[in-house]
A protein has these predicted regions:
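Extended, charge-enriched "interface" segments that sit outside catalytic cores
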Residues: 1-112
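Internal helix-loop-helix
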Residues: 76-170, 211-213
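Short glycine-rich loop/turn motifs
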Residues: 120-123, 173-175, 189-192, 217-218, ...
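Acidic, glycine-rich active-site loops and adjacent beta-strand->loop/helix elements
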Residues: 141, 149-151, 162-167, 180-183, ...
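Buried hydrophobic positions in well-ordered alpha/beta secondary-structure cores of metabolic enzymes
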Residues: 143, 176, 194, 203-205, ...
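Internal maturation/activation junctions in enzymes
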Residues: 151-192, 196-199
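Short Pro/Gly-enriched beta-strand edge/turn motifs at strand-loop
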Residues: 172-178, 202-203, 249-254
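A short core secondary-structure module
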Residues: 200, 204-251
Length: 254
């Protein structure tokens, strides 16, 4: 039982260690072989969420991201600038395996699959510390799953080393741009188009709600020219924010 009266503030505490119910559920749901190596990781994230992540959130909540449309010369930039505290949290979460693939990779090295209850526990702790970041940091694993399942080999070779990088500086985070003004769940009304141009596709349209708007690898939906009406004419695309030559990929943020 948690005696809340002994806490002046939750910030500065380990949010795994002070949560007996979370510890109980991990012992109950995890195989003992997994629990032995995963509990130290859970404890590490508990200290991270209860410490620097929660402390930074007190500051970053008062400093919203800033959209910079143009550079000093008037050329399109469309860059989202974050408070340094938000970037530090993003880095810490990636390195700890909350948003990055480190724990999945470690489980694979052990010949295991990472139990689904573990990401749930990590997100449970993060949601109490920095709820505003929970959506964006959860996008990368979804994009990884789509690339592994649907992308041709040459696309996988280009994207997967970055999407699965364990170190933040080498990593590309994922995003999902799906919702349009015509409706969030009615994909049959999607209006974004895709036109073939040699070995590339040119997408034209607008998305209304973008999860992790400034991420590097964007999963999105568009309707190829000549495609069928309704859902059967919708296709899935993977869009890099930056082209191979380092140039801006024509994505405009409003």
């Amino acid at each position: 039982m948690i005696d809340y009266a002994e806490f002046q503030s939750a910030i500065g505490l380990n949010w795994y260690d002070i949560d007996p119910n979370l510890q109980l559920q991990m012992r109950r749901l995890l195989d003992p072989a997994d629990f032995d190596w995963l509990e130290p990781e859970l404890r590490k994230v508990g200290a991270l969420c209860g410490g620097p992540v929660a402390a930074r959130a007190e500051i970053t909540d008062k400093h919203s991201p800033e959209l910079v449309k143009f550079d000093r010369w008037g050329d399109p930039l469309d860059e989202v600038r974050h408070h340094p505290g938000a970037l530090a949290t993003k880095r810490d979460l990636w390195e700890a395996g909350v948003s990055g693939p480190r724990l999945y990779n470690e489980a694979r090295r052990r010949g295991r699959h990472l139990p689904e209850v573990v990401p749930t526990a990590l997100n449970y702790m993060l949601s109490q510390a920095e709820i505003g970041m929970l959506c964006s940091v959860g996008m990368t694993s979804g994009v990884i799953g789509l690339v592994r399942r649907f992308a041709p080999p040459e696309v996988q070779r280009e994207f997967m080393p970055h999407l699965t990088a364990e170190h933040f500086d080498d990593a590309w985070d994922g995003a999902m741009f799906m919702t349009e003004k015509t409706g969030g769940s009615d994909l049959a009304t999607l209006t974004t188009t895709a036109r073939r141009d040699g070995d590339r596709w040119i997408l034209n349209g607008s998305k209304w709600f973008c999860s992790s708007v400034d991420a590097s690898a964007i999963a999105t939906l568009a309707r190829p020219d000549g495609g069928a009406e309704g859902l059967r004419g919708v296709a899935l695309f993977l869009v890099p924010r930056i082209r191979r030559d380092g140039s801006h990929n024509g994505i405009s943020i409003r």
